[in-house]
Amino acid sequence: MRSDRIKKGFERAPHRSLLRATGLNDGDFEKPFIGIANSHIDIIPGHYYLQEYGRIAKDEIRKAGGVPFEFNTIGVDDGIAMGHEGMKYSLPSRELIADSIETVMNAHQLDALVCIPNCDKIVPGMLMGALRVNVPTVFVSGGPMKAGHLHDGTPIDLNTAFEAVGKRAQGQLTDAELYEIECQACPSGGSCSGMFTANSMNVLCEAMGVALPGNGTVLALTPEREALVRRAARRAVEIAADERFKLRNIANRDAIHNAMVVDMAMGGSSNTVLHMLAISREAGAPLSLRDIEEIAGKVAHIAKIAPSLATVHMEDIHRAGGVPAVLREAARRGGSVREGALTVTGETVGERIRDARTADPELIRPLENAYSPVGGLAVLFGNLAAEGAVVKTAGIQPSMRRFTGAAICFDSQDEAIAGIMGGKVKPGHFVVIRYEGPKGGPGMQEMLSPTSLIMGMGLGESVALVTDGRFSGATRGACVGHVSPEAAEGGVIGLVQDGDRITIDVEARALTVDVPDAELARRREGFRPKRRDPGSSWLRRYAHLVTNAANGAVLRSTDL
């Protein structure tokens, strides 16, 4: 066992002495040492109860013949960090989480790992760190929260609350109506109830085979979720000494392909593209945006979940058959799903989905009745995004799939929010928010506040938005993000001027600004990208090391 390096031989007597101080005895030194990476944190609704799941996992590991060692990571709630300078820390937290997993696991030479994440950057951060460690690993998330409901039974979620702010600003909601939404949108613990970033990533873990069936859709704080935690912990002990289940053997190229298939079939958050680019690099099977676009062209969009379809939430998809049913339906298009991929249970993906059935063909549609013959995410290219940009096509109104508008430019999210609230943004505008990329922000803030204001103020079918920042999984509308190169590295988005005509064409996979090359070259003369001092040594280091969104916003490992 790997842990023999800290517990076997006379020269390890000091190490064993320290371990005995934690309660270990002679018999424990013959057992596998299992790490539990828990992301319990009180301020996040999807994480405040994970301490109990950690306790359950430790109990099950002991019963199964292992020795558990729990440790914690940090976590950032993107919803609470939204719309102020706190959002600059969200994406960078992914790197801290990955580094902390690598540090604890390798410093103590633990044999296997159980990861208990749930929300936003915590899932990809744990995956990235666990892939570096490359021991047998099982993921089990905290699970999605229930959908909220208004007094008349209308289902709502966190996105409803964000869009309600725009409606209140327009006088379309009373304070009492806004208060009801505030109090009912998030009715329980768990990751926010739609196909937002957290649930998208937990679904992708299941599709990759690094988590057990049900990981993406079983509700939080239910007996079914607790049973999933117990099974995951026992499985970690069972596979601790089996090299077949080292994480890179499970999360390989085929598994990453299957994750993107489910992402396209379910119209996941655009953040998944950013994270899967980074995860694939740690797995040694790097994806490119071109690869992702190729997968999107071969996978039908068969399930719509909030925010794309406001009445459907994760609990509904679970009742309809969950991720196995989505994979089984997607597999009917020959070659779409890599069915031979091994999962952490020891089954192949094909074996896992063989008996899956769709209980509601309106929630998980057959290929013949798909929402679209291609995936719910798209990668766009053009003179405004030479290295690529990403749009969640599942959330775009049909009338906005091809749109040309006059640019109205803002050099920060705060400027954009003030401009939208102040009435500067009119029908026919193409809002440009720049200097919000990984380097320029720094931190690549999510633009949920401005996009929700646009929707809430009734501009969703007459205004588009483009940014080198990113979006919450709750964003919907004609919103293009991840523009690369970003403004801070001299991208064309930094050269756009008010009034320039910008076109998004989803079918053509194009994002262009109607400015001649000669004029762009003239504007570039003397152009100096703006530089912001974030006032933080960590964010300064991050801005110096981070790559752009087309590269997954990973940190360079050289040029320190």
Swiss-Prot record:
Pathway: Amino-acid biosynthesis; L-isoleucine biosynthesis; L-isoleucine from 2-oxobutanoate: step 3/4; Amino-acid biosynthesis; L-valine biosynthesis; L-valine from pyruvate: step 3/4
Cellular component, GO annotation: cytosol
Highest taxon of the lineage: Bacteria
EC number annotated for this UniProt entry: 4.2.1.9
Reactions catalysed according to its record: (2R)-2,3-dihydroxy-3-methylbutanoate = 3-methyl-2-oxobutanoate + H2O; (2R,3R)-2,3-dihydroxy-3-methylpentanoate = (S)-3-methyl-2-oxopentanoate + H2O
Residues annotated to bind Mg(2+): D78, D120, K121, E446
Gene3D superfamilies for this protein: IlvD/EDD C-terminal domain-like (3.50.30.80)
GO molecular function: 2 iron, 2 sulfur cluster binding; dihydroxy-acid dehydratase activity; magnesium ion binding
GO biological process: isoleucine biosynthetic process; L-valine biosynthetic process
Root EC class: lyase
Residues binding [2Fe-2S] cluster, per UniProt: C119, C192
InterPro entries: Dihydro-acid_dehy_C (IPR042096), DihydroxyA_deHydtase (IPR004404), DiOHA_6PGluconate_deHydtase_CS (IPR020558), ILV_EDD_C (IPR056740), ILV_EDD_N (IPR000581), IlvD/EDD_N (IPR037237)
Required co-factors: [2Fe-2S] cluster; Mg(2+)
Keyword tags: 2Fe-2S, Amino-acid biosynthesis, Branched-chain amino acid biosynthesis, Iron, Iron-sulfur, Lyase, Magnesium, Metal-binding
Signal peptide bounds: none
Keyword Protease carried by entry: no
Active-site residues per Swiss-Prot or TrEMBL entry: S472 (proton acceptor)
Subunit structure: Homodimer.
Protein family: Belongs to the IlvD/Edd family.
Function noted in UniProt: Functions in the biosynthesis of branched-chain amino acids. Catalyzes the dehydration of (2R,3R)-2,3-dihydroxy-3-methylpentanoate (2,3-dihydroxy-3-methylvalerate) into 2-oxo-3-methylpentanoate (2-oxo-3-methylvalerate) and of (2R)-2,3-dihydroxy-3-methylbutanoate (2,3-dihydroxyisovalerate) into 2-oxo-3-methylbutanoate (2-oxoisovalerate), the penultimate precursor to L-isoleucine and L-valine, respectively.
PANTHER family: D-XYLONATE DEHYDRATASE, D-XYLONATE DEHYDRATASE YAGF-RELATED
Record protein name field: Dihydroxy-acid dehydratase
Organism: Anaeromyxobacter sp. (strain K)
